[in-house]
């Protein structure tokens, strides 16, 4: 059996990477597509509901799919450094792939506004972390200005190679199911991922590898929902830090994906997002970060209203692992922590008192 070596090797003929380049990979991709068994019973709906668990990529998020291609191309073109603005996941991924490549990484993050797990990832991988007194959108503006003056390669999703890598998730979904889903539900922040998935679905459809295309359903947090407002949001705020973005860089292509697929954008409150995160963990054992849960929360609400009809095949993207932001999960958990004496009798009594 040939070992899996990463998505560039797996899909090289569909990616803008020539045969002679040095591939910068951490064996990203090939993430599980998990059928939810218990939640459909809880909501009492006839639905085939799956989650694409991108939190099992090397740095714990979907960003690795695009980063392997972006950093591979940067190194091939002679770049000695990469730069990004980030709400956390991009910085973690850029730092790891830059370390793998042996080049520098500069990451701009909003001071005090990203989860510590993500900050730790960037720091331990050796990135130069610049904490700016501003939000992601201010950081993105600065990254563009710096890249116009300094010899650094931007690895945010405005880098077209990022989306080329991220489209492979759609390939994997079709290969796992033997078809495209009826609906694909996905969290939306900077909007590169909904754009990339639509690219991937269209490519397989064009080449006869799928007979249908899904409707793309993008979900934003209410405090950071420019697609719902119809304009950018200057001061986005949400507990779902990964989608706390008011000026999406992929605005136009995401709108196009929405229109072409006859899908929709919708918004969820922070309370709805956290409830979906908790439901996934408690009922299915799948732990994702809050932003990821927006896809499931949105899908469940649309199933309840029959906007997504009964009998549908639905895939929800879980963009990042729950360990990215454990503090929020601990604060909202209903699990009891019981202090007991270190004796058999005390432990046995605690177990019997808490049996379901």
What are these regions (language model features)?
Residues 1-356:
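PLP-dependent amino-acid enzyme catalytic core
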């Amino acid at each position: 059996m040939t070992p899996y070596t990463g998505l560039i090797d797996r899909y090289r003929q569909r990616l803008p990477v020539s045969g002679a380049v040095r591939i910068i990979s951490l064996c990203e991709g090939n993430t599980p597509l998990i059928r939810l068994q218990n939640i459909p019973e809880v909501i009492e709906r006839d639905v085939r509901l799956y989650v694409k668990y991108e939190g099992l990529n090397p740095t714990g998020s979907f960003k690795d799919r695009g980063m392997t291609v972006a950093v591979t191309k940067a190194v091939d073109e002679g770049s000695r450094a990469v730069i990004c603005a980030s709400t956390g996941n991009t910085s973690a991924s850029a730092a790891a792939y830059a370390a793998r490549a042996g080049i520098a990484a500069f990451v701009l993050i909003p001071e005090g506004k990203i989860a510590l797990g993500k900050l730790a990832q960037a720091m331990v991988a050796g990135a130069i972390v610049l904490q700016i007194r501003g939000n992601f959108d201010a950081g993105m503006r600065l990254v563009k200005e710096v890249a116009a003056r300094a010899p650094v390669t931007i690895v945010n999703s405005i880098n077209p190679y990022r989306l080329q890598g991220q489209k492979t998730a759609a390939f994997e979904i079709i290969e796992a199911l033997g078809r495209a889903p009826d609906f694909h539900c996905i969290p939306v922040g900077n909007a590169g991922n909904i754009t990339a998935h639509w690219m991937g679905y269209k490519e397989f459809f064009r080449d006869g590898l799928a007979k249908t295309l899904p409707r793309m359903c993008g979900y934003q947090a209410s405090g950071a929902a420019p697609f719902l407002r119809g304009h950018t949001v200057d001061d986005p705020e949400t507990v779902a830090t990964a989608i706390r973005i008011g000026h999406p860089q992929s605005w136009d292509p995401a709108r196009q994906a929405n229109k072409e697929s006859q899908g929709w954008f919708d918004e969820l409150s922070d309370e709805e997002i956290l409830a979906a995160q908790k439901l996934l963990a408690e009922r299915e054992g799948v732990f994702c970060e809050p932003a990821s849960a927006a896809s499931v929360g949105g899908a469940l609400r649309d199933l309840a209203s029959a906007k997504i009809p009964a009998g549908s095949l639905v895939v929800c993207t879980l963009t990042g692992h729950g360990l990215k932001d454990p503090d929020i999960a601990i604060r909202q958990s209903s699990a009891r922590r019981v202090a007991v004496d270190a004796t058999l009798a005390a432990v046995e009594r605690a177990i019997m008192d808490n049996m379901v």
